[in-house]
Amino acid sequence: RSRGLGDVYKRQGYAEHAAALTSSHFCSAERQYRFPLEYGGVRTPTAQWTVTGSGALILGASGNGPRVTMVTTGKIADAGITDANNMGAAMAPAAYETLKAHFADTGRTPDYYDLIVTGDLGKIGHAVVMRLFQDDGIDLTGLYTDCGLLIYDLEGQDVHAGGSGCGCSAAVLAGHLLKLLESGQIRRLLFAATGALMSPTASMQGESIPGICHAVAIETQVNT
């Protein structure tokens, strides 16, 4: 959202430079949304590991770096998931709806992009998005991945379903994906950050966890 809003402000002349930054912390997230580490609870296979990390992007009105060419603002999607240890499944429908809306609004097909990356769906959410597009007759194999799959070694580090948190997508985009764009390894990136409108109190009362997703297209070679 901050990347998208920053680009809007820049394009409308409200700002010459805008900073989009965020962070997350493992212990803080566990204590606030699940259980304190001292509790010693066993993590479920669907649980993800909140990234202790941060990332920042500087958006400018001019320059030669990668450009934000499209912004697709998502809408809330609620699949009825109530398990705070299965956030990937809770957020996946929102990612699917936003990506589908992006392709419909722009007239682009998935293969227009060199890489499509979601924020922090992890192994479970990534599989859900793949399946939803397969049901539409669209195969994203080899084209689509998720920051939660990229930031950790899932097997070697035993992080169960992968990484999560605001810092997950921010760190992967600022520290890895932008380098791919700048080096020319990829030229067109569709980045769809994911999130949840989650309240610990509502979750304890058994209420569902709605998801949200906003997408930005970042390109190094723009057709004019």
Where do the language-model regions lie?
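Single conserved hydrophobic/aromatic residue that forms the stacking wall/gate
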Residues: 1-9
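Short, well-ordered, mixed-charge alpha-helical segments that flank or form enzyme active sites
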Residues: 26-31, 76-80, 125, 198-200
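Condensing-enzyme catalytic core mediating Claisen C-C bond formation in acyl metabolism
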Residues: 36-100, 105-108, 138-149, 155, ...
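A short, acidic, amphipathic alpha-helical segment used as a generic capping/interface helix at domain edges
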Residues: 99-104, 170-182
